[in-house]
A protein has these predicted regions:
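Short glycine-enriched loops at secondary-structure junctions
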Residues: 32-37, 82-84, 221-225, 231-233, ...
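A short glycine-rich, hydrophobically flanked beta-strand micro-motif that places a catalytic Asp/Glu
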Residues: 269-281
């Protein structure tokens, strides 16, 4: 039995990860930002602690984290969210050297290359991997060689075109991402976004159908793919482009091949999660970003028969992750995040017309991100957490704008 520490332990993906790690016989501890959350309330965690928020109180979290490691012994640390993955990648070398604890995250140099949206697009462009036209936007303080900011923006837009998306290079989810339809609108909105989020890129706007794809991969040390899952996300919230609340597992060899090539060029080791859009007009697929940690839709992989939890253990604590036999892969699995799906139902004009019906709660191929009959509290706590968030007018405005 190994002792495993999960960071961002309040996250919904902790529910299924803890369940599967528990089945494998490991002792699980989580650091959580709040108690009213899906992750904190799952019955599959053995120990849980409320910690400072790694994003909002970075220094306080760092102090808490190292004090916690002094008092507890672990064999493996797995980050379960964007901010904790970023934090752990920076601290990986120190943690592994000083505390002899393996960190299931890439080294910071590789992590940053994948996490930086502009740098990732440069890799895709260089190696002819499917992606939208993207160019770095200049510093808003640009003065070099007498160049005017407007002229540089104009040259960028000549390649990218309109409509386009201003995308911060480093941000979680859709934070800071803004659609613009003209050079004038870009000039107006870009400085404010850059001041808030730092370096940005301008990316071709992809008019997508009413779905997008998510690709999960685990790449071994020897470069071979241990396991993969592709899901077609058909309901998401917010409606303008958000997190999956209903998806279906599918087979898509082309997407797997493209994402594998991307990880190869990054010299990636471990788990990675890709968001991929399909151009509604051309049908072409485009990699948008990599999330270098397990996503909220992780339950879909387990529903498909792919055990990423075992891959983590075998790769980091054993003799290497086994290669999954795709003959055992299950397409057509339906996975819901009930708490978020309720928000979709309240806001979507398709609430009664969507197929399969929103009211199809049970079935042999239906499972939930946020719990089950055997572990119901994450669904209750997660739904309550969502209600509390949307009572905040600032949060509500940020999520529902556009």
């Amino acid at each position: 039995m190994s002792k495993i520490l999960l960071l961002d332990g309040e996250s919904v993906q902790v529910v299924c990860m803890a369940r599967e790690l528990n089945k494998l016989g490991h002792e699980l501890t989580a650091l959580c930002v709040q108690k009213v959350s899906s992750g904190y309330t799952t019955k599959y965690l053995h120990h849980k602690y409320v910690s400072p928020n790694v994003h909002l109180k970075a220094e306080a979290f760092k102090a808490y984290f190292y004090e916690h490691l002094k008092q507890h012994k672990y064999d493996l640390i797995i980050p379960m969210g964007d901010e904790s993955a970023y934090f752990l990648s920076r601290e990986k070398e120190n943690v592994e050297r000083q505390y002899r604890i393996i960190c299931a995250v890439e080294t910071y140099s590789t992590f940053e290359l994948a996490n930086d949206k502009q740098k990732l697009m440069e890799v895709c462009e260089k190696y002819d991997i499917v992606h939208p036209h993207t160019r770095a936007l200049p510093s808003i303080k640009l003065k070099a060689e007498g160049s005017e900011l407007k002229e540089v923006l104009k040259s960028v837009t000549e390649y990218v075109g309109f409509p386009a998306m201003i995308k911060p290079n480093l941000s979680a989810g859709a934070k800071g991402i803004t659609k613009v339809g003209s050079l004038e609108e870009l000039e107006e909105k870009f400085p404010t976004i850059a001041k808030s989020f730092g370096a940005c890129a301008l990316q071709q706007y992809v008019e997508q159908p009413d779905y997008y794809y998510n690709v999960m991969l685990f790449r071994r040390h020897d470069g071979k793919t241990a396991a993969s899952t592709v899901i077609k996300i058909r309901r998401f919230f917010p409606l303008k482009g958000g997190t999956s609340c209903y998806s279906e597992t599918v087979e898509h060899p082309f997407l797997i091949e493209q994402c594998e090539r991307c990880l190869e060029k990054l010299n990636w080791h471990g788990f990675a999660d890709f968001d991929v859009l399909e151009d509604k007009c051309t049908g072409k697929l485009k990699i948008i970003e990599i999330n270098p940690r397990v996503p909220s839709s992780l339950q879909a992989s387990f529903a498909a028969g792919v055990n990423f939890a075992k891959a983590f253990i075998d790769e980091y604590l054993g003799n290497g992750a086994e290669i999954f036999d795709m003959k055992n892969y299950k397409s057509g699995q339906q996975i819901r995040w009930f708490g978020l799906d309720v928000m979709w139902f309240l806001m979507s004009p398709q609430r009664f017309s969507f197929k399969p019906s929103w009211f199809r709660f049970w079935g042999k191929n239906v499972s939930y991100h946020d719990g089950s009959w055997h572990d119901p509290m994450p669904m209750v706590a997660g739904s309550l957490q969502g209600v509390m968030k949307y009572l905040d007018p600032n949060f509500r405005k940020a999520k529902l704008k556009g």
